[in-house]
Amino acid sequence: MSKVYDWFQERLEVQALADDITSKYVPPHVNIFYCLGGVTLICFLVQFATGFAMTYYYKPTVAEAFSSVNYIMDEVSFGWLIRSIHRWSASMMVLAMILHTFRVYLTGGFKRPRELTWVTGVLLACLTVSFGVTGYSLPWDQVGYWAVKIVTQVPSAIPVVGDLIVEFLRGGAGVGQETLTRFYSAHTFVLPWLTVVFMLMHFLMIRKQGISGPL
């Protein structure tokens, strides 16, 4: 084992990296509420793993989406557990994100020089809500269908470009297969990649600037 370690140490200096990760100074005022960002990250990782597992069985078509979800729940081994964990962790992620945002705001963590950290955090909050909106529609049941219809109709109130936004979100004039395809693509590809990018930026800035001091 030591030979493997020595091989990596010689080439990558892994000990210096490990020391940097494990020896970061933590201010004495930090309490359990400062862990809410980490809880949000853990929920995202659980979402990623369980969501990836369900893509093996889910069929993103208006004719088969609902039946494929039922198949996951009733026929796939532990499918009911995987989907339930996905739903529970989604709710927990939203809750942790909201509490984390309030904690940062109330403790002044958004102030100079951490403005960009706050901006990336707000963008991550928007992405989290977008996950909920797009994921809610994927079973394509009555609740999901009408939720999509209402949500995609909201931008129509915007002057000039409102109707164009609605058509872009729906993939056409009405809600149908094109809408489900776009929401599925956003939920499983676009939003996860954007979240990873902004999370990386968020964490790198936190590592660079450290945790904000007490009020």
From Swiss-Prot:
One GO term (biological process): respiratory electron transport chain
GO cellular component, one term: membrane
Membrane-spanning intervals of the chain: 32-52, 90-110, 116-136, 186-206
Residues that bind heme b 1: H100, H202
Membrane topology of this protein: Multi-pass membrane protein
UniProt superkingdom: Bacteria
Main subcellular location: membrane
Record-listed heme b 2 binding positions: H86, H187
Localization per record: Cell inner membrane
CDD domains assigned to the protein according to its UniProt record, in alphabetical order: Cytochrome_b_N
Sequence similarity: Belongs to the cytochrome b family. PetB subfamily.
Note in the entry: Heme 1 (or BH or b566) is high-potential and absorbs at about 566 nm, and heme 2 (or BL or b562) is low-potential and absorbs at about 562 nm.
Protein name, entry field: Cytochrome b6
Organism whose genome encodes this protein: Gloeobacter violaceus (strain ATCC 29082 / PCC 7421)
Taxonomic lineage of the native organism: Bacteria, Bacillati, Cyanobacteriota, Cyanophyceae, Gloeobacterales
